[in-house]
Amino acid sequence: MSMFFADLVVRTDEARRAFETHPVLLDAVAHGLPLERYRTLLLELYHVVWHFNPVSAAAASRLGDSHKQVRYFLYEHMHEESGHEEWVRNDLDAVGVPAATTQAYAPSAFTRALVGYN
């Protein structure tokens, strides 16, 4: 594990634990998600995954040499994440959401903020 990643894990541990014990997540794990909620989750996820590489590229381009390790981390993950939007599209197809609906879907303000301000 790289030092950068190890430090990232330590620094985000409290937030990760809060997420893992959030009542909505615990309820979904215990009882599952209604199909419509799962479709919405996938539609939101599609937009996050679709924008991951452009957002990462923009972030990497702004990093100076003092943050080379972060830049290389972003490059590596851009490569690893390429094409994952197709995985989400396949899941959307499997639950009856046509491609046209995915393209026309307006993501929530939360998703737009995540994609637009990172």
Say what each PLM segment does:
Residues 2, 22-23:
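Serine-centered coil/turn micro-motif
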Residues 1-11:
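Alpha-helical transmembrane segments of integral membrane proteins, especially early/N-terminal helices
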Residues 1, 34, 67-70:
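Residue-level recognition of alpha-helical structural elements
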Residues 69-118:
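Active-site-proximal alpha-helical scaffolds that flank and shape metal-associated catalytic sites
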Residues 9-20, 27-64, 83, 87:
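Alpha-helical bundle segments that constitute or directly flank the non-heme di-iron/ferroxidase center
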